[in-house]
């Protein structure tokens, strides 16, 4: 009887181990993981990356016919006819770029004169393991007041995340907003929402 009881315990333990292994395999252990998109956020999807945007805060996707040719995807926050926030994805925006550092240098050059860099750091993104290395640049700038942007002199906050996808295509993902409209936690969530393919 003891043997039967022990055997039953081993069978139960074996079933639990098999179930755990099955769940691990289904969850993609060692494979592609995805960024964490917070509740109340939407997602912009492109062939190289996907990124979250704060939909509940008023951001909405811009139709392809309305966005600039350099942008693969855009979400805008428009208030009283002014673009007070933007999330954009640019792909293949520079030539001769082979890694995250080079992508960040090219993307950083596009931040513009008069911008103040606040921080630059290496980050690890979710997604294809070969393409997870990226660089984050935090900066501030002053709105020009042109092209439906906030009044001239308005301080703006920005973050750009740059890297190279698994097919060696450089990407730059930006979020800009009127300073104070997005918290540091929101900006961290933006970076954490990225999945690179």
Predicted features along the sequence, with ranges:
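Short, ordered beta-strand-loop transition motifs
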Residues: 37, 45, 64-70, 124-133
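Extracytoplasmic/secreted envelope proteins and their assembly/folding machinery
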Residues: 101-108, 157, 184-191
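Signature of long, low-cysteine stretches enriched in small and polar/charged residues
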Residues: 105-162
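Bacterial N-terminal signal peptides that target proteins for export
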Residues: 3-16
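Surface-exposed amphipathic alpha-helical segments
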Residues: 57-59, 168-197
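Secretory pathway targeting signatures of secreted, lumenal, and periplasmic proteins
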Residues: 50-105
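C-terminal motif of bacterial Sec signal peptides marking the signal peptidase cleavage site
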Residues: 24-28
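Short, low-complexity, disordered segments immediately C-terminal to signal peptides
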Residues: 29-47
């Amino acid at each position: 009887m003891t043997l039967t009881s022990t055997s039953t315990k081993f069978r139960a333990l074996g079933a639990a181990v098999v179930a755990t292994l099955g769940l691990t395999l289904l969850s993609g252990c060692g494979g592609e993981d995805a960024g964490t998109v917070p509740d109340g956020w939407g997602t912009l999807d492109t062939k190289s990356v996907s990124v979250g945007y704060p939909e509940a805060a008023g951001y909405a996707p811009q139709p392809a016919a309305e966005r600039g040719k350099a942008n693969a995807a855009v979400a805008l926050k428009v208030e009283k006819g002014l673009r007070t926030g933007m999330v954009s994805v640019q792909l293949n925006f520079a030539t001769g770029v082979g890694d995250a550092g080079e992508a960040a240098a090219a993307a950083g050059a596009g931040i513009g004169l008069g911008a103040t860099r606040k921080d630059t750091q290496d980050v690890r993104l979710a997604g294809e393991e070969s393409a997870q290395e990226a660089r984050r640049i935090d900066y501030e700038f002053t709105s020009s007041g042109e092209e439906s942007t906030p009044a001239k002199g308005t301080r703006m906050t920005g973050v750009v995340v740059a890297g190279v996808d698994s097919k060696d295509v450089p990407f730059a993902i930006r979020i800009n907003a009127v300073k104070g409209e997005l918290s540091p936690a929101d900006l961290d969530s933006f970076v954490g929402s990225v999945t690179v393919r």
